[in-house]
Every structure is written in C-alpha cells, then in structure tokens.
Amino acid sequence: DVEVELGVDFFANREELEKSADKVVFTGMIDQYFDYKHGELEYRSLRFEHEVLDEENYQGNAVVNYTEREIPYTRIIEHKHFEYGTQPKTVITREYPADWKRGDEPYYPINDEKNNAMFAKYQEEATKNDKVIFCGRLADYKYYDMHVVIERALEVVEKEFTK
C-alpha cells in the first residue's frame, strides 16, 4: 500500500514521516532538505493579480504570453476558456515575474554556473540516501514541461521498482 498525505509540513514532521515508510518521495526544495549546508539555491518567483471583468470575453484564449520588454506581465490567463465557459463576466489573472526569497513560492530555478555547481553538491548528497526518492522540479532543480514531468516520473518508478 502507498499512503499519501497532503497538506503536511514535511519539515515540521520530518522524523515521524521518514520513519513511517521504507521509502519517502521528496518533491520539495533539495537545498532545504539538506538544511542549506551547501548554500541556498536561487529561483525566480511569480506574482499574480486577479480581476473580474464585466465582459463576456477578454482575449479569446485561455493563455496569452507576452514577451515585450515594455509589458510588465508575462502572461494573462482567462480561466473560462479552459472549460469553454459562456458566463456573462470573465476572470483574468496577470502573471508577473518576481524576485524570490526564502518563504516565497519557488517557480523557476536559476540555472547558472553558480547554482548548477551548488545543485551538483546536493545531488551528490541525495545519491547517498537510499531511503529518499528525490524527484520533481524542486528536488531536481529543473524546470519541467508537463510531458517531461510524466517521463521523469516513469523513469523514477522504473528505477525504484524494477530492481
């Protein structure tokens, strides 16, 4: 049996959780797992602004990306288009890039030379721990598109369960 617990602070319950299973899947920040012993990896974060508009359609698509330097946000999401909604109003969300600091949501790793070298040290630590499966964008310190996430999950399952 596989037990899944959601909404649990791993670090507040770490000892209990690690004792509760033969293997633990850790998808959080790898540097945090190792108590930042090699330094703090850097991320980019995001900030969101939501707005209800008194119109049926704002942009005609669920997601429109903006790459122009003069436009401060990187995309607008019009939620009703994910479900082909026909409501008389619409809700949009503007996504803005933001600097990351500890405690913020880490969205994108900053894969420069310094961070990659630091991550390699954490990765080496992770290989010494056969009780924990490190995977996911934060544990792998890598941005993943959805199809790659699925591929990575299948690789981890194959490695862990076909021994």
Language model features with spans:
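Helical element adjacent to the flavin cofactor pocket in flavoenzyme catalytic cores
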Residues: D1-K37
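C-terminal segments that line or cap access tunnels to active or ligand-binding sites in enzymes
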Residues: A21, Y33-K163
